[in-house]
């Protein structure tokens, strides 16, 4: 009896080894730039592995399912230094038979990387760039967008402000290009949902030290003066992606008004305070592995890697074209702890997703808001809809 039992164990080990030997390797690249952008708040400094940590967690999740399907997922990081060419880096990953690349790159670098590997069948997953043009006039057939767009973020915020009847906005815009792009999305959202921008002001970045010993005293004097003599408004909306001034606005405006946009009530794809729809277990797993909270970029990278894992499991394939065809099709969806399964817009390859509205400690609300209807999906009330798109996938 003992001999039979030992023999059975031996056969089991051999069978397991055979399965492992025959498993299909699915390599995923992670392409991003070195360094992190400093923030005004010391408690919000991004980690060196921001985004990458989310992708690593998703690889674990993919392999949990993959072991039953003879699929094994790996992640290969490629960190670009200043001056490194994103196109060459993407090509180098493709040379190593990596068919999927999660990219956290600026818009122009992302396009160069996508074009460099387009004819090789490599699919990029945009985890970081929120530029609408990447899904519109500059869209690519081999780029799937897990990150939301500026217009989706602006629409999610606008829906809540309108639902609250805070329809009169004072818009304060930074002087950098990305600030102007966010302001453009906010103007579009206001017009779309019935809000009115009663006044716009520009906050010029004059340079200088971002933190000084006299900072609190100086800012306490500057911000009330900057925001005084405004027409009647319900909420101050800030467009400051460069993070020059917006964090200084709450509690410092001349009139006692709430702040939203780049500070105060902030639209985002994920927040450390998200605890609904099973998110607590995700937050706890991430915290245990990384000794920090999960950011929006972490979640976007996690979602991108999970999209690959879901498509591989459903098609039982590792072929990039087969997975891309499935992702574009009507049967694809992915769960992401947001109350509903997420699907892909087939006209520009943007992932539909709810937008969280958070104040730094709690998730205040989740858009789309009640009453904002759509004939296909209420998620399509966020961002550019099919009739509006300029995308011609090529």
Feature locations, PLM:
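Extracytosolic ligand-binding ectodomains
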Residues: 2-8, 19-394
